[in-house]
Regions:
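Conserved beta-strand-loop-alpha-helix junction that forms the acyl-donor binding cleft
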Residues: 21-22
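Vicinal oxygen chelate
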Residues: 1-17, 27-88, 92-121, 130-137
Length: 137
């Protein structure tokens, strides 16, 4: 694979730890719910996923299974972390994510700041917000 294609895009790349050896399931969910493209994956010898790089909505997202034996951070309940998707059609992105099993935290609705916005939790415990400018007539 071309090394340039594997480079993260954007100035900040979230790197998620997925509990319970479910990183491969998370890739499938992000592909179906958020239209993720898989750039690469690197499995560990024991079958866990050591590293994966996805692209969602033009930005990079990296993830891996939990590796506590390497003294990495144990996946905890996310506190204060929200992954935001700014899109053209919030309803389409929202409906696809909910259909794939995301849990609604804050209903998608028109907000005072001018976006249609809502919050979801994916099946792996990570919180996402989806927003799009409210269409003006």
């Amino acid at each position: 694979m071309d090394q340039d294609l594997q480079e993260p895009e954007g100035g900040l790349t979230p790197h998620l730890t997925i509990r319970d050896r479910r990183a491969v399931d998370a890739i499938d969910f992000y592909r179906q719910a958020f239209g993720a493209d898989e750039v690469m994956r690197h499995p560990a010898e024991d079958g866990r996923l050591m590293h994966a790089h996805l692209k969602i909505n033009g930005a990079s997202l990296m993830l891996h299974d939990d590796f506590p034996e390497h003294h990495g951070a144990r996946a905890s309940d996310p506190a204060g972390v929200m992954l935001h998707l700014q899109v053209d059609d919030a309803d389409a992105w929202w409906n696809r994510a909910v259909a794939m099993g995301a849990t609604v935290i804050m209903e998608l609705a028109d907000q005072f700041w001018g976006d249609r916005y809502g919050q979801l939790e994916d099946p792996f415990g990570h919180r996402w917000s989806i927003g799009a400018p409210i269409a003006r007539n």
